[in-house]
């Protein structure tokens, strides 16, 4: 069973089950305590619905910006891991798709 990180209705990052588990774990560990509401919202389909996806669709620009910053912290922390090269491509895809989201006002950059 595979998973997905949904950015918007049209944009998602499809991942294998192992990639999904890896990303969700690493990203989840990097939320600041003041931003846990964002984690709760994004992780809701997985935590309460038992689904194999997380979604940023409902976040406004501020929430998405915080999520991107959290992803960047998680990616940086993961670089020290021996397994990082196995996941580097999927990290890059996720960061690129988040940065292109119109809610961040940097579409196309």
From Swiss-Prot:
Coiled coil: none annotated. It comes from the Bacteria. Transmembrane segments: none annotated. CDD domains: CdiI_BpE479-like. Immunity protein component of a toxin-immunity protein module, which functions as a cellular contact-dependent growth inhibition (CDI) system. CDI modules allow bacteria to communicate with and inhibit the growth of closely related neighboring bacteria in a contact-dependent fashion. Neutralizes the toxic activity of cognate toxin CdiA (C-terminal 160 residue CT fragment) upon expression in E.coli. Does not inhibit toxic activity of CdiA from other strains of B.pseudomallei. Specifically interacts with cognate toxin CdiA, which inhibits the toxin. This is Immunity protein CdiI. It comes from Burkholderia pseudomallei. The gene is cdiI.
């Amino acid at each position: 069973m595979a998973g997905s990180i949904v950015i918007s209705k049209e944009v998602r990052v499809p991942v294998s089950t192992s990639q999904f588990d890896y990303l969700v774990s690493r990203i989840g560990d990097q939320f600041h305590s003041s931003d846990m509401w964002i984690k709760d919202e994004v992780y809701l389909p997985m935590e309460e619905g038992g689904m194999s996806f997380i979604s940023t669709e409902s976040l406004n620009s501020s929430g998405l910006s915080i999520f991107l910053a959290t992803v960047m912290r998680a990616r940086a922390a993961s670089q020290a891991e021996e397994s990082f090269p196995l996941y580097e491509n999927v990290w890059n895809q996720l960061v690129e798709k988040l940065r292109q989201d119109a809610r961040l006002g940097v579409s196309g950059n």
